[in-house]
């Protein structure tokens, strides 16, 4: 029985997107425009009150949240592991997962739920004020084998690797339960700061590694992406190195595949491109498609999300993606 993807994600954040009429609130709270600040709940509440009455929207936040949402839209059966507070924000997070058809494996913490207030200036630039709260309270002790019952793969977002005990326990438990383990390296500076841990984690437990060019070079200590791909593939079963507008290189055993990008894509906002690429690729793997088919679906989902501001688009776009994915399944549309 295949239920697709289990997802461990420590930083469960609800995004509150607020459209500002001016940048005055940034000056009032001494927020550098375009920055991301970690704050306590008191300051975040004060900022939220100061923009009360302005247009806003709520959505699932975080890198893994993007991936899990896209996979659900692609028809995969998915679950989400994390911790929220005992509050209305936590209730929203759980309900949003259920509305997507995602199984919420959500613990309740003692702190308030994590939230990112994204202040959108009239010129479109975002200034983010983040309170992590209960999202930081998920511990290794809460990772139980029963969480992984019925799943094929655990996907780990690289942004949370600073909690070594949690990630190691999740990966080890998933492997013991017979799951594949996939990780997205997330950011080259995080890779550099956790290099020894990440290399050991990949060697010991990880089957699938996603990385962009900078992350791959940092992880492998190689100057060329092809050499980095080779190095990563020697540590795991399947390596995927994304090289921007040149597409992606994929290596499984002796098989190396280069897949292009969605040619029609307009680069409006690259937020979430890597998250959506992983979603498309893993969705293909869940259907046992070829590496080229998986890479093409990843390129389609990534190509579509960069055509919009943010990571949310309408049903018409998803219908277009579904149409293209069906062509990929029939090998009539490959990059």
Give residue spans per PLM region.
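A short, aliphatic-rich alpha-helical micro-motif
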Residues: 2, 147-149, 202-203, 233
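Glycine-rich phosphate/adenosyl-contacting loop at the front of the ribokinase-like
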Residues: 3-79, 335
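Conserved phosphate-binding/catalytic region of the ribokinase-like
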Residues: 6-7, 12-20, 30-33, 225-335
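Substrate-binding N-lobe of the ribokinase-like
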Residues: 43-115, 319-329
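Anion (oxyanion) recognition and catalysis
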Residues: 72, 98, 175-176, 233
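Hydrophobic beta-strand scaffold residues
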Residues: 78, 104, 181-182, 239
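Conserved phosphate-binding/catalytic loop of the ribokinase/pfkB sugar-kinase fold
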Residues: 105-108, 118-161
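Conserved phosphate/ATP/ADP-binding segment of small-molecule kinases
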Residues: 171, 177-180, 186-258
């Amino acid at each position: 029985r295949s239920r697709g993807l289990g997802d461990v994600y420590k930083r469960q954040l609800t995004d509150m997107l607020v459209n500002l009429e001016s940048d005055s609130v940034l000056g009032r709270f001494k927020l550098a425009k375009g920055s991301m600040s970690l704050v306590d709940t008191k300051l975040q509440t004060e900022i939220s009150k100061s923009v009360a009455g302005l247009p806003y929207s709520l959505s699932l936040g975080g890198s893994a949240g993007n991936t899990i949402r896209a996979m659900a839209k692609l028809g995969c059966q998915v679950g989400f592991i994390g911790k929220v507070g005992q509050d209305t924000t936590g209730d929203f997070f759980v309900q949003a997962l259920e509305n997507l058809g995602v199984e919420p494996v959500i613990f309740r913490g003692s702190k308030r739920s994590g939230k990112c207030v994204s202040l959108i200036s009239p010129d479109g630039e975002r200034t983010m004020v983040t309170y992590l709260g209960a999202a930081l309270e998920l511990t290794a002790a809460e990772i139980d084998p029963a969480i992984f019952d019925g799943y094929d793969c655990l996907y780990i977002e690289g942004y949370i690797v600073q909690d070594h005990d949690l990630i190691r326990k999740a990966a080890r438990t998933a492997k013991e339960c017979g799951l594949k383990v996939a990780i997205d390296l997330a950011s080259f500076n995080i890779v550099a700061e956790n290099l020894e841990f990440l290399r050991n984690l990949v060697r010991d437990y990880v089957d699938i590694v996603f990385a962009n060019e900078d992350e791959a070079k940092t992880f492998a200590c190689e100057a060329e992406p092809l050499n980095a791909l080779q190095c990563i593939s020697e540590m795991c079963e399947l390596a995927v190195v994304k090289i921007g507008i040149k597409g992606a290189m994929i290596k499984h055993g002796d098989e190396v595949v280069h897949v292009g990008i969605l040619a029609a894509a307009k680069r409006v906002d690259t937020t979430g491109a890597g998250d959506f690429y992983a979603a498309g690729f893993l969705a293909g793997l869940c259907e046992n498609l070829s590496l080229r088919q998986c890479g093409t679906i990843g390129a389609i989902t990534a190509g579509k999300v960069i055509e919009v501001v943010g990571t949310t688009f309408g049903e018409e776009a998803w219908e277009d993606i579904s149409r293209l994915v069906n062509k990929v399944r029939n090998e009539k549309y490959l990059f």
